[in-house]
């Protein structure tokens, strides 16, 4: 089944089964110019409804994969095709495995120096067929960005992981797309932290139940206020259903 893009409350979301993911990745590798894969939570979803740089970058992404269960529930509630939910870490590992099986290349961008080195070391031991062609720390000075872009462009990787310490997040690759001739760009904030074992990944059972947000609230209690955009999402769904 081909990947289908639906519009939920005006926000694009892709319906991409786990079986179709490999074919889609291969298509992006063959595509002329850079590509972008984005994971979105329900709070990302609500931001995309606004007019801003972040929304623009996601709306133009080549593959938009939902993380939050509530996005799937919303699609079902409005009688639309229901997307497949992705655990970002599992999806990231699957993408790396696809690249490794075809001896493709990879560039790591983000994280602190120590964590980045540990992440690269662990990846080299796990994905032996994957060519890691470069790495660059996040939290960099603005004047260093052009050199970073040139380094990535010169390495010409099949996949660029954009991780923590990149202020523009998904918008970084979109805003610089004219400076790259190829490659898939994927923003996943926690990737370097998990790969370096500095951050513990969400328990798969907790993720399956859709309870991963509670871990985020424990780490940052202010995230409890995310309940308000979620309630607005529910109101919008009901309004759209009725009217």
Residue ranges of predicted features:
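N-terminal nucleotide/polyanion-binding subdomain common to many enzyme families
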Residues: 1-87
């Amino acid at each position: 089944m081909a990947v289908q893009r639906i519009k939920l409350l005006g926000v694009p979301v892709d319906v991409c089964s786990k079986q179709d993911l490999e074919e889609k990745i291969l298509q992006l590798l063959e595509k002329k110019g850079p590509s972008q894969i984005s994971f979105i939570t329900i709070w990302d979803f609500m931001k995309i409804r606004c007019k801003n740089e972040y929304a623009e970058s996601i709306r133009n992404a080549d593959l938009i994969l939902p993380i939050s269960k509530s996005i799937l529930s919303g699609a079902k509630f409005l009688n639309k095709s229901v997307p497949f939910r992705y655990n970002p870490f599992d999806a990231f590992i699957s993408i790396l495995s696809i690249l490794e099986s075809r001896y493709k290349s990879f560039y790591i961008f983000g994280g602190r120096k120590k964590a980045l080195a540990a992440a690269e070391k662990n990846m080299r031991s796990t994905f032996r067929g994957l060519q890691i062609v470069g790495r660059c720390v996040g939290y960099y000075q603005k004047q260093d960005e052009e050199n970073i872009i040139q380094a990535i462009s010169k390495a010409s990787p099949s996949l660029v992981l954009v991780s923590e310490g990149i202020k523009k997040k998904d918008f970084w690759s979109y805003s610089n797309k004219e400076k790259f001739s190829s490659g898939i760009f994927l923003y996943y904030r926690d990737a370097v932290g998990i790969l370096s074992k500095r951050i513990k990944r969400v328990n798969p059972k907790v993720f399956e139940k859709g309870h991963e947000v509670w871990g985020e609230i424990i780490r940052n209690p202010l995230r409890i206020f995310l309940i308000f955009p979620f309630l607005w999402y529910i109101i919008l769904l009901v309004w759209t259903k009725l009217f």
